[in-house]
Amino acid sequence: MDVTLNEVEVRVLGSLIEKELTTPEYYPLSLNALTNACNQKSNRDPVLNLDEGEVVRALDSLKFKQLALLSGEGGRVPKYRHALMEKLRLDPPELAVLAELLLRGPQTVGELRTRGERMHPFPDLPAIEEVLEELMARTPALVMRLPRQPGRKDSRYAQLFAGEPQTAAEQSPPPEAARLRVVAENERIGHLEEEVVHLRGEVAELRRLVEEFKSQFE
């Protein structure tokens, strides 16, 4: 992508797309409705707790990046919509897949089909794969296939509006509990060895003083 979005912008954009596809009768969205959509607990990973100020700042940034618009200016209540149709010429299947990736993060083809059904009907897995291939073939690409995770059969796909995600291989794995225990034990043993050396020095000094004291009476 030629723009990079932060976490809040990603959530706002994904929510706008989702509501257009699932509840078109209530779209475009007011600020209050959009904030509620961003914070809803279902179909979100992670669940966020944004306030209206954070959503407004994200909207301003998305408008500057030509990804969102104020709809029906001059109306009693300002309403907002995404601008992906105008900017990127995306069709409903592509929008549904992108919305799911924006709202939940990297997912497999199977997960995208199951979860994306509420926004657009996908007859089978090849239909999802075709959409993903189209999104990856764009210039710049909107989606990428991630390296397969150890122990997982299927690859996951990620949106690129927020830049390339860090793969598991690139992340520093958290220390294993057993390894942490070994490190702590080694540190404790090291401290004990230092104390033993110190005590031996004190004992040797005491012996020397005792010998000096005894020599005074010989």
Curated annotation (Swiss-Prot):
SUPFAM superfamilies: Winged helix' DNA-binding domain (SSF46785). InterPro entries: DUF480 (IPR007432), WH-like_DNA-bd_sf (IPR036388), WH_DNA-bd_sf (IPR036390). Pfam families: DUF480. PANTHER family: UPF0502 PROTEIN YCEH. Belongs to the UPF0502 family. This is UPF0502 protein Geob_1184. It comes from Geotalea daltonii (strain DSM 22248 / JCM 15807 / FRC-32).
